[in-house]
Design a protein with these regions (language model features):
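Post-cleavage N-terminal segment of exported redox proteins
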Residues: 1-17, 38, 151-164
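Electrostatic cytochrome c docking/interface patches
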Residues: 1-28, 56-60, 86, 135-137
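Sec-exported extracytoplasmic/periplasmic mature domains
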Residues: 7, 28, 66, 70, ...
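The canonical Cys-X-X-Cys-His
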Residues: 23, 27-39, 49, 148-155
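Glycine-centered loop/turn positions within well-structured domains
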Residues: 30-33, 99-101, 130
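Gly/Gly-Pro-rich "capping" loops immediately C-terminal to redox-active cysteine motifs
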Residues: 42-66, 78-126
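Low-complexity, glycine/serine/threonine/alanine-rich intrinsically disordered linker
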Residues: 75, 95-99, 108-110, 126, ...
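Intrinsically disordered, low-complexity linker and terminal regions at domain boundaries
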Residues: 117, 121-138, 142-144
């Protein structure tokens, strides 16, 4: 399992002459598109990464991937619904209709849904756990991770300075 201590210095000092093709392959291998929009492709269940390079440094992007629950956008924060019988359901609200709440319980499958009767709800809390799993970089080596981050920062443009 990678740490920010291991990858942070490289994110600050080794972001030139990265490999675009490897970065693009790693973006696919790490399943980023399952939840994140990038250009004209990908999911809508996580933040759009197209302009991430204008908002985050390489260091910050690595920190977000290593620690996805550190900061969760309100737009993508799951909720935990506790029912009167103490059963719980977690997910992203996709529909509120009268006495019914529909949650997407699996962000990689938009059809995985649970309907909750609001009249039987004991409590609703915003989850402190990101739907983005930890360990997404575990199977990649350091060079592949840096190429992946360069790819995201570039917005998918091979002529970006990170690849020169």
């Amino acid at each position: 399992e990678w740490t920010l201590g291991e990858l942070g210095p490289a994110a600050r000092n080794e972001m030139k002459k990265r490999d675009f093709d490897t970065g693009k392959r790693m973006f696919t291998a790490a399943a980023c598109l399952a939840c994140h929009r990038f250009g004209n492709a990908g999911g809508m269940n996580g933040p759009d990464l197209t302009g991430a390079g204008g908002r985050f440094s390489a260091y910050d992007l690595i920190d977000h991937v290593l620690h996805p629950s550190k900061e969760i956008s309100d737009q993508f924060a799951p909720i935990v619904v506790t029912m009167e019988d103490d059963d719980t359901v977690s997910g992203i609200v996709v529909n509120l209709n009268g006495d019914s709440v529909t949650l997407n319980t699996d962000l990689t499958n938009p059809n995985q849904r649970a309907n909750v009767d609001r009249r039987k709800v004991k409590s609703i809390e915003v989850s402190k756990i990101s739907p983005m799993p930890e360990g997404l970089l575990a199977a990649l080596n350091k060079s592949e991770i840096l190429d992946l981050v360069a790819y995201v920062i570039s917005g998918g443009h091979p002529d970006h300075p990170a690849f020169r």
